């Protein structure tokens, strides 16, 4: 978040002292998260002159091409290589980050552990199982680009109604529309 806010201010014309800039030049960068944000972090780090860039993802490597496990209208879970990936990085899957390591207030690496995904007998969401195989990935810059499963639902007053991404997390616009209709019916009943 801090890096993005700083970059937005720079693009708007604000200047920062060199020692205050968040910059990947000369750094070993670890990107935690495999989505679009992670891809953006990779490209920016490479362009800024990172010594190395590694991207880790807790999920398994998705299949190339059509994935029968995610038919339309679900978001297709397929292997993607973006232009940022092509700029250069190491990509690894089925790794959970256990702890950040550091010295003198600066990160030096992240302890990661391989995980297995056990399919659910009922076809539902698989269960993650740590394998005990741990290693340390050296890094002096770690960028968090992780997604989320669903939004946390805080307790709202009875007269507050949610719809769309605020209720379900990022999803299809048709689901947001259905949520809007449901919220309207609840408001009407209230």
List PLM regions with ranges:
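Residues forming the flavin
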Residues: 3-190
């Amino acid at each position: 978040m801090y890096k993005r806010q700083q970059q937005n201010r720079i693009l708007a014309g604000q200047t920062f002292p060199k020692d205050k800039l968040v910059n990947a030049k000369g750094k070993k960068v670890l990107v935690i998260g495999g989505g679009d944000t992670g891809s953006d972090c990779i490209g920016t780090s490479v362009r800024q002159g990172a010594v190395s860039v590694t991207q880790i993802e807790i999920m398994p490597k998705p299949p190339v091409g059509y994935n029968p496990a995610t038919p339309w209208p679900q978001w297709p879970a397929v292997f993607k290589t973006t232009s940022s990936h092509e700029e250069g990085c190491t990509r690894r899957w089925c790794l959970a980050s256990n702890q950040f390591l550091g010295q003198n207030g600066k990160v030096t690496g992240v302890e990661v552990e391989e995980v297995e995904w056990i399919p659910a007998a009922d076809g539902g969401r698989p269960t993650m199982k740590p394998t005990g195989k741990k290693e340390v990935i050296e890094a002096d810059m770690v960028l968090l680009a992780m997604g989320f499963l669903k939004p946390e639902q805080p307790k709202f007053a009875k007269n507050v109604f949610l719809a769309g991404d605020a209720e379900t997390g990022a999803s299809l616009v048709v689901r947001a529309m259905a949520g809007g209709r449901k919220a309207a019916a609840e408001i009407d009943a209230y």
